[in-house]
């Protein structure tokens, strides 16, 4: 089966590359993926694969039912996100974005193309497995409330046993894949704080309450409690980073209010709840010390992404079977977030990373940058690997 899938992924390579380049050239922002959805539907229809449309907006869910009479018979969901980012692409490649200010800078074009290729392979091989495989083409990963939460609310993953997803990763060389068991990616919530004081003349402190001083003290206190650090030991306590502090005063004018915006991240849901309480209480108490008040609003983002230990180990072993075992790596936790986390909170899930960088080809830009690109050789790897994992899981092939 491994060789059959590899050969099919090789024969589909040009198709998958063409799809990826088309999507890259015509990117669409979150929940606006109308033409992207059309590309997906047209390809699935051309392969004779059944699908549902307009799920959670422009989402598409395709299904292939295995016809083999074999033990196992699991239902597996494979997920790809499909939205782009509000970034102006700076590239000279022939497939660079023609939609001004919109770019596939996170690799969702590649995710979609690889999942379409996997759907084609799995459909061709439906006589070799039992069970059911769903292909979830999800809108809106980059924007709250996250397309994953809406797909779940729409029942798109009803009766699913496992969910598997892959994400391009420029920190790994093309040819490698990375796995991590347990808490893998952080939760991500948006922190909004408004400090209200009494504005006035800079030279008359008795006539004003300085909201700017209160805001600065809040940032200082919270930063000591939840420091920015690249070490996992400190990350386990949570990370809070403020990226915006706006005080609309001037040289001799103290503003009546200051707004602050930041991101809050942790791997632990209990810690997530306690951080929210601490941020709110400390902000109110500190503001009061300066004769000010605080309005605190923390918008729930994505929960922490938890890879199921047993499923992730199975997927890692299957990857070692499909690829050169030396290319299958253990990778550390990441403070970045992905709404695949919603699936991981609802079902046993595995979210792994696929390497896409190639320094020798000059492909090494990071995600969410204007020059991001991938070594397209990774498309064949991702297409074949996802197919092999899904069919093996359906047939209950456990390499333990």
Residue spans for each PLM region:
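Histidine/acidic-residue-rich, glycine-tolerant segments that coordinate divalent metal ions
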Residues: 60, 85-87, 91-103, 110, ...
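Metal-dependent amide/peptide-bond hydrolase catalytic core
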Residues: 216-400
